UniProtKB/Swiss-Prot annotation:
Catalytic activity annotation: a phenol + 3'-phosphoadenylyl sulfate = an aryl sulfate + adenosine 3',5'-bisphosphate + H(+); 17beta-estradiol + 3'-phosphoadenylyl sulfate = 17beta-estradiol 3-sulfate + adenosine 3',5'-bisphosphate + H(+); 4-ethylphenol + 3'-phosphoadenylyl sulfate = 4-ethylphenyl sulfate + adenosine 3',5'-bisphosphate + H(+); 4-nitrophenol + 3'-phosphoadenylyl sulfate = 4-nitrophenyl sulfate + adenosine 3',5'-bisphosphate
Functional summary from the UniProt entry: Sulfotransferase that utilizes 3'-phospho-5'-adenylyl sulfate (PAPS) as sulfonate donor to catalyze the sulfate conjugation of a wide variety of acceptor molecules bearing a hydroxyl or an amine group. Sulfonation increases the water solubility of most compounds, and therefore their renal excretion, but it can also result in bioactivation to form active metabolites. Displays broad substrate specificity for small phenolic compounds. Plays an important role in the sulfonation of endogenous molecules such as steroid hormones.
Family: Belongs to the sulfotransferase 1 family.
Annotated InterPro entries: P-loop_NTPase, Sulfotransferase_dom
One term of GO molecular function: aryl sulfotransferase activity
Source organism of this protein record: Bos taurus (Bovine)
Enzyme's top EC category: transferase
GO terms classed as biological process: dopamine catabolic process; steroid metabolic process; sulfation; thyroid hormone metabolic process
Name by which UniProt lists this protein: Sulfotransferase 1A1
Tissue: Distal lung parenchyma.
């Protein structure tokens, strides 16, 4: 994987008013010709909400718990990232061309930028939502280590941008709410990161039911064990350690950092939390979604 040297810290590029990583914004043109297949399964999240975790769970389900098969390639190749693009690397769409059915694919795109083919084909979607405070903290550390993002600045200024929807992929509030609304008219299984942390087996059973598959209980237990944070953090096929340091610098922050609920409490000041709570109440007024800040 050779990357040319201009990957570092490009400013965000706005598409339909939504800020995106520059290279991903440039991939949206070619993405218009992407054709979804009815048996595709889309994993959708706002960044830092459990995408890699659920990708690995689903690949293990598709491989019927066969760990060897899930070691065939890094998770970002096994579950192509729809809008991914970076200099010198195959795009997500290029990877999908070589992926046999039934395909797993992932996206962070808000609905305004999602290829229409996915909705036209009634592709099943598994959406994972995570509480906004933990997302903000995790996203800040991800910005720091993944150099395709703009410079994150200080935590204080990053939090302000996050609240204003001025980070890559835009507003968390809009993202979680619009995909929730879609779940009323489209085949979307809407899951919560906190629920998977609390009882992964229960949530995996929901996934199996949604995709119309069944596995022996011992296989499900095996999947739970293999997709624990501890296991995935040390697995080179899931921890992104195969990505060049020029793109992701794990010495700044690990891709798989803590994987817990409530980490925001170690980062938010009292004043930041009060400001965030007031802003959150306004942005989520009238929304039926309820998030847990700790377990």
């Amino acid at each position: 994987m050779e990357l040319i040297q201009d990957t570092s810290r490009p400013p965000a590029k706005y598409v339909k008013g939504i800020p995106l990583i520059k290279y991903f914004a440039e991939a949206l043109g070619p993405l218009e010709s992407f054709e979804a297949w009815p048996d595709d399964l889309l994993i959708s999240t706002y960044p830092k909400s459990g995408t890699t975790w659920v990708s690995e769970i689903l690949d293990l389900i598709y491989q019927e718990g066969d760990l060897e098969k899930c070691q065939r390639a890094p998770v970002f190749l096994r579950v192509p990232f729809l809008e991914f693009s970076a200099p010198g690397v195959p795009t997500g769409v290029e990877l999908l061309k070589d992926t046999p059915a039934p395909r797993l694919l992932k996206t962070h795109l808000p609905l305004a930028l999602l290829p229409k083919t996915l909705l036209d084909q009634k592709v099943k979607v598994i959406y994972i939502a995570r509480n906004a405070k933990d997302v903000a903290v995790s996203y800040y550390h991800f910005y720091r280590m993944a150099k395709v993002h703009p410079d994150p600045g200080t935590w204080d200024s990053f939090l302000e941008k996050f609240m204003a929807g001025e980070v890559c992929y835009g507003s968390w509030y809009q993202h979680v709410q619009e995909w929730w609304e879609l779940s009323h008219t489209h085949p979307v299984l809407y899951l919560f990161y906190e629920d998977i942390k609390e009882d992964p087996k229960r949530e995996i059973q929901k996934i199996l039911e949604f995709i119309g598959r069944s596995l022996p209980e011992e296989t499900v237990d095996h999947i739970v064990q293999r997709t624990s944070f501890k296991e995935m953090k040390k697995n080179p096929m899931t921890n992104y350690s195969t990505i060049p340091t020029a793109v992701m610098d794990h010495s700044i922050s690990a891709f798989m950092r803590k994987g817990i609920t409530g980490d925001w409490k170690s980062t938010f000041t009292v004043a930041q939390n009060e400001l965030f709570e007031a802003h959150y109440a306004k942005k989520m007024a009238g929304c039926k979604l309820r998030f847990r800040w700790e377990l």
